[in-house]
Amino acid sequence: MAQIPVFTTEQAIDGLRQAIHGKAVNFYAMYSSILGGVVTDPALMVVPLDDHMVHRGHAVFDTATLTHGMLYQLDAHLDRLIKSAEGARLPLPFPRQQLRQIILETAAASQRRDGSVRYWLSAGPGGYGLGPAECIGSSFYVIVFKQEAYPQSYYQEGMRLVTSQVPIKPPLFARIKSTNYLPNVLVVLEAKERDADNGVFIDQRGMVAESSNMNVAFVTQDRVFRHPPFDAILAGITIHRVLDFAQRLVQQGGLNGVRLADIPVEEARNAAEMMLIGSSIKVAPVVEWDGQKIGDGKPGPIAAKLLEMWNEDTQSANDQLVGVPYEQETRGTA
C-alpha cells in the first residue's frame, strides 16, 4: 500500500486545482469572512473543516436570484436569513447593511448578470465540539453560481409527485432555513426511486405541508387559490410573492379567492390544479400525485398565469429588484 503523501502548502494548492471537477465552471465567485474577501478560482472556494456549519450543521442560509444584473427580492431573503439566525441562536458577524453590501459586491465580482447568489451564516470555526462557545466568531460565506435549470417538461407536461414516507421536520426546525437538509434530500431520493419528480410532506394530522424545498399550492374546483398556513413550514419568499399575484387574479376575475388554511390530503387530491412554488423552480404545475391525476391531468391555466407573472416581476418590479454595482468592482493586487 502506497504511503499517503504529506503536502507542502504549494503542493496542496496545486492538488486542489488539479482536483477541480467539470461542474466547477459554474461557480463564479465566493466571499469568505475567514479570508476577508472574494475569490474567483473554484479551487479556493473552500470552508474550514472545523467550521461548525460543516460538522454540526449549526448554520443558516438563503438564496437570491440574479437576473439581468439585478438581485430579485434580496431584502426579503436577507431578512429571512437574519430571522433564521435568531432562531438558530447565531450572532451576526456584521450589521445587516454590511451583509447586504458583501452579497452585492460578491455578485459584482462574478461579472455575471444571471445566476443564483447563496449565502450562509455559521457559528464559525474553532474546534470539533458541539457547542459554539469554542468558535472564534460567526462566519459568513457567499457564492455566485449558475442557477439550477429544471426540465422544460415540468412546465410543458407537468410534474409527478408522491407522498413521502420521510418524517416531516418539527415546526421549530421547519421554520428555520438551516443547513440541516437531510430530510429534504431523502424526500427527493425517495421520489426518484418511485419514478416521480418530487415528494410531498404530510403532517401527523394528515394535512399537506410542503415539498422537498418548495411550497405546495392548489386551485380548488371553485377557483380558490389554497395554501397551507406557515406555522409549521418554511415561509417561502416566492410563495408570498405568488400570493400577491393570486390576489391580483382575484381582482381580475381569474380566481374567486385566496385562502391560507389547513388542507386535508383528500381535499387536495380533488383540486383542479396543484403546483410547486420556489425561487428556483418558480411555479411548476403538478399533474399527478401518487398515480392519481390532478384535475384533467394537464398543466392548468392558473399555474401558467402565475409563472408568467413571476417572470414579468423578475424583470420589471422595481420595488423587488436591487442593482448589482458592477462598476464598483475592485480586485486585490496581492
Positions of PLM-derived features:
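Helix-start/capping segments and mature chain N-termini
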Residues: 1-93, 101-105, 131-334
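Non-catalytic accessory segments adjacent to catalytic cores
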Residues: 108-110
